[in-house]
Amino acid sequence: MIGYLRGRLHLVTPEGILLETGGIGWLVRTVTNRSWPAPGTEIAVYTQLVVREDAMELYGFTRPEELHLFTLLRGVNGIGPRGALQILGAAKPEQLSRAIAAGDSAFLTALPGIGAKKAQRLLLELKDAVLKSGLVDGTETEAIPAGGGDNDEALAALLALGYSREEIGPILARVRQELGNAAPTTAVLQAVLKTFGRGGGD
């Protein structure tokens, strides 16, 4: 099993990087929005080899926390390695871990490729694993309200993303006024994130 590679960054591709080590070029799939240093720079990645019937693919991450979450996500029914990589490209490990530990389905459904049913499955299968892994302090989940209404769900998701209540309050109120109180949480989140310049979309 290849768990770690250190070498010279040879090329950044649309799907990852080409890492040269010992005269061998390793094609490593990574999150597509990662900022990499200039070619020729020495870097290190934590890796996992995924073996399929028709191919072997190496996935790499700059932090061990990302690799651990990637492994956990792959274990959820309906989430493959590329789906897990897409999720990790949309949320930082700390944000994703807090959302899972807090049972925050609103945050999860705002991520690409995750609908309501998949979010519930993810929470059911990973909440205990995330809490036991040390990826998140159990006390951090207390800051996220349990929810009950759409306002609470949207607020919880935005808090999990790292925004403060002071930042969220006025924008969330304006979006609610524009979209109406019956607007689904996902639509509210997308509108708020667009205001912050982070976009939305499924």
Curated annotation (Swiss-Prot):
Cell location: Cytoplasm
InterPro entries per UniProt: DNA_helicase_Holl-junc_RuvA_I (IPR013849), Hlx-hairpin-Hlx_DNA-bd_motif (IPR003583), NA-bd_OB-fold (IPR012340), RuvA (IPR000085), RuvA_2-like (IPR010994), RuvA_C (IPR011114)
Transmembrane segments: none
Positions of region (Domain II): 63-141
GO MF term list: ATP binding; four-way junction DNA binding; four-way junction helicase activity
Family named by the database record: Belongs to the RuvA family.
Cited function: The RuvA-RuvB-RuvC complex processes Holliday junction (HJ) DNA during genetic recombination and DNA repair, while the RuvA-RuvB complex plays an important role in the rescue of blocked DNA replication forks via replication fork reversal (RFR). RuvA specifically binds to HJ cruciform DNA, conferring on it an open structure. The RuvB hexamer acts as an ATP-dependent pump, pulling dsDNA into and through the RuvAB complex. HJ branch migration allows RuvC to scan DNA until it finds its consensus sequence, where it cleaves and resolves the cruciform DNA.
Protein name: Holliday junction branch migration complex subunit RuvA
Lineage: Bacteria, Bacillati, Bacillota, Clostridia, Moorellales
Gene that this polypeptide is encoded by: ruvA
